[in-house]
């Protein structure tokens, strides 16, 4: 019985190595295909494979006397079908690609490494009564069920399912990359020459991860609970990569027979040949062109073509747009026929054609049109020679770009454009020194005008306050002892010109204007009242002389506003020069001015006539006084009794109080 039990245990150990190899390799590799038979050992089905059985013969032929070496099962990504145009990348958890290698550089990438062994260990640690074959069998059933579950959860299984998914069933039989397995003797050294080993960290972010164990940060390690036997412990350990989302980028170059222009890169994603859905190819089709525009997404790798036959470009590039001139819009439309763009621009702005702009024949851009493609690189830079006559609104019209030489490439145009940008051009910046000087002088002049402006504002306020409040009936006085001619109060004085300064040096132009004004006033009064006496004209002439000497004292007051009344009811006469008071003797409160608003700026108003009353500086003598009384008496006898009424009405409008 003991011998039979030991034979069963030895047989279970051999079956353990075979079943573990089948469960690890079969679900995630297409290389192992069963012949239709199933292996139902340990109550779990698996396809029987003669190749796997032959590979593990050294472990299945265990007789209990020999020492078994560890069994190593490597699972790798086969890259032997890739060419130099392929690039293998690995995407991390965020979807960021990390370059692994180019095709032909490495033959494979290690994904997993399994270690199946019979650990003899220390014989003293073995139990005195080892378990029998039935107990070991039950424990192995649980172990293989756990092993099968673990293989379905590893990242390599997801990669296999993606490569061999239902979406790739219609592709070719052999993909460019595939998952393979290898069975090795663990007692021999394992070389990683020509392949990406398991210890290599592809994603650089794992180098910053703090790891307290001996396992690398980009790897994971799982251990299955060992099963003790009388010959040692059965152990299974696996180390695998955390990330296995590998992809292959391929750039293929196809030349079309019916294409007269050079091929331009057109990138797109395409499933790989065979059942590989993750293979992305960047194909270059000769019958497709590239248009660099905001709507075009450009990605991929461009392989330069040294062939001299493809020198033309089938793309159209418009790197810049010019702004508008005036109120119109500037538009450069694509013109594939190579004709002038003026007609196209005129068609676009059908509503605004009010500008006549003449542009010389010099072209703005130099597009390239090589071969039969007929496409152009149009640029808004170049030498512009314009002769423009612009009206109120319109747009700038640009002529068509001239044709380039047939032998030029599109890249030469771009290089010339970059060189033009790098050239340093002098900027005509206007110096502000003269402008600063002008501003300073303007400020000085403005400050000097402030005092004059204040004086003018005050004078205008006083002039406005002296405006008559009512319009009396027109009456004329006939008797006056004043040397200033009397005028009708019906004339409305909206403003009284006053002096802005107290300088005594009055210009000859101002004196002449005053004389002319006095003459006009005398003419007007003479037409209304009749004729003036010779003594009156002499008095006016004498007053003009006095005006030149004493124009700075009484020029700012119109004494026609003063109110003089005679309480005795006797005949009223105008004031003589001896009875006039200077306006400077009146207090501001004594003069009944109307409240007016302050003027912030000089105000001018048109007036029909101006009257100025000046204080006479001559002293009166008895002879002069008697002469004036005599002349006044003679004049009063000629005009009659109505003169008294006229004089009374005129004097009543003088509103200056006699306080």
Swiss-Prot record:
Task: Output compositional bias ranges, type Polar residues.
Answer: 525-542, 562-579, 617-627
What are the subcellular locations of this protein?
A: Cytoplasm; Preautophagosomal structure
Q: Region Disordered: list its residue ranges.
A: 260-280, 295-320, 353-409, 525-551, 560-579, 612-644
Instruction: State whether keyword Transmembrane helix applies.
Output: no
Q: What does the record give under GO molecular function?
A: armadillo repeat domain binding; lipid binding; protein kinase regulator activity
Subunit (UniProt):
Interacts with ATG1 to form the ATG1-ATG13 kinase complex.
Q: Which domain of life is it from?
A: Eukaryota
Gene for this protein? ATG13
**UniProt entry keywords in alphabetical sequence:** Autophagy, Cytoplasm, Protein transport, Transport
Name one matching Pfam family: ATG13
Described by its record, this protein's role is as follows: Activates the ATG1 kinase in a nutritional condition dependent manner through the TOR pathway, leading to autophagy. Also involved in cytoplasm to vacuole transport (Cvt) and more specifically in Cvt vesicle formation. Seems to play a role in the switching machinery regulating the conversion between the Cvt pathway and autophagy. Finally, ATG13 is also required for glycogen storage during stationary phase.
Q: Which family does it belong to?
A: Belongs to the ATG13 family. Fungi subfamily.
| Protein name per the record | Autophagy-related protein 13
Would I find GTP-binding among this entry's keywords?
Answer: no
- Quote the InterPro entries the UniProt record gives: ATG13, Atg13_N, HORMA_dom_sf
């Amino acid at each position: 019985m003991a011998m039979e039990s030991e034979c069963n245990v030895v047989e279970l150990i051999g079956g353990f190595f075979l079943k573990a190899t089948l469960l690890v390799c079969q679900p995630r590799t297409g290389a192992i295909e069963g012949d239709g038979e199933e292996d139902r050992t340990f109550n779990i089905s698996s396809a029987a494979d003669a190749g796997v059985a032959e590979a593990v013969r050294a472990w299945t032929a265990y007789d209990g006397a020999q020492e078994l070496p560890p069994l190593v099962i490597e699972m790798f990504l086969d890259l032997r079908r890739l060419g130099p145009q392929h690039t293998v990348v690995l995407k991390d958890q965020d979807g960021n690609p990390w370059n692994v290698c180019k095709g032909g550089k490495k033959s494979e990438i290690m994904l997993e490494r399994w270690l199946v062994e019979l650990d003899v260990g220390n014989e003293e640690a073995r139990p005195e009564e080892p378990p029998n074959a039935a107990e070991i069998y039950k424990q192995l059933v649980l172990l293989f069920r756990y092993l099968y579950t673990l293989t379905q959860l590893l990242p390599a299984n997801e990669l296999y399912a993606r490569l061999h998914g239902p979406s790739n069933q219609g592709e070719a039989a052999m993909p460019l990359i595939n998952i393979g397995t290898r069975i090795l003797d663990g007692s021999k050294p394992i070389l990683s020459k020509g392949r990406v080993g398991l210890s290599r960290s592809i994603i650089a972010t794992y180098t910053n991860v703090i790891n307290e164990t001996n396992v690398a940060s980009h790897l994971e390690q799982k251990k299955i609970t060992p099963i003790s036997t009388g010959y040692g412990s059965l152990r299974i350990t696996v180390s695998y990569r955390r990330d296995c989302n590998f992809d292959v980028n391929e750039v293929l170059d196809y030349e079309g027979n019916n294409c007269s222009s050079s091929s331009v890169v057109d990138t797109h994603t395409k499933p790989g040949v065979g059942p590989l859905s993750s293979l992305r190819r960047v194909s270059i089709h000769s019958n497709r062109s590239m248009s660099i525009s905001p709507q075009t997404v450009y990605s991929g790798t461009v392989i330069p073509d040294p062939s001299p036959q493809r020198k033309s470009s089938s793309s159209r590039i418009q790197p810049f747009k010019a702004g508008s001139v005036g109120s119109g819009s500037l538009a450069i439309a694509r013109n594939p026929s190579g004709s002038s763009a003026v007609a196209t621009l005129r068609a676009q702005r059908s509503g605004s054609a009010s500008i006549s702009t003449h542009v010389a024949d010099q072209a703005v851009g130099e597009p390239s049109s090589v071969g039969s493609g007929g496409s152009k690189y149009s640029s808004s830079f170049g030498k512009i020679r314009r002769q423009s006559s612009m009206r109120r609104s319109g747009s700038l019209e640009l002529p068509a770009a001239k044709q380039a030489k047939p032998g030029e490439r599109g890249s030469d145009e771009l290089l010339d454009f970059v060189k033009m940008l790098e050239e340093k051009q002098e900027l005509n910046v206007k110096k502000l020194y003269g402008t600063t000087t002008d501003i300073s002088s303007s400020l000085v002049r403005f400050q000097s005008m402030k005092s004059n402006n204040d004086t003018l504002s005050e004078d205008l306020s006083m002039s406005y306050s002296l405006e008559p409040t009512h319009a009396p009936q027109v009456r004329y006085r006939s008797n006056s002892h004043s040397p200033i001619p009397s005028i009708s109060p019906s004339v409305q004085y909206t403003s009284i010109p006053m002096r802005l300064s107290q300088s005594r040096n009055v210009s000859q132009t101002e004196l002449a204007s005053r004389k002319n004004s006095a003459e006009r006033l005398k003419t007007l009064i003479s037409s209304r009242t009749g004729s003036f006496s010779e003594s009156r004209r002499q008095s006016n002439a004498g007053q003009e002389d006095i005006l030149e000497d004493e124009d700075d004292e009484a020029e700012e007051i119109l004494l026609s506003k003063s109110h003089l009344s005679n309480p005795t009811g006797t005949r009223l006469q105008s004031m003589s020069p001896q009875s006039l008071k200077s306006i400077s003797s009146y207090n501001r409160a004594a003069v009944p001015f109307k409240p007016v608003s302050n003027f912030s700026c000089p105000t001018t108003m048109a007036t029909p006539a101006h009257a100025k009353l000046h204080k006479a500086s001559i002293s009166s003598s008895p002879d002069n006084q008697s002469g004036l009384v005599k002349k006044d008496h003679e004049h009063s006898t000629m005009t009659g009794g109505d003169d008294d009424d006229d004089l009374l009405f005129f004097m009543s409008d003088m509103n200056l109080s006699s306080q």
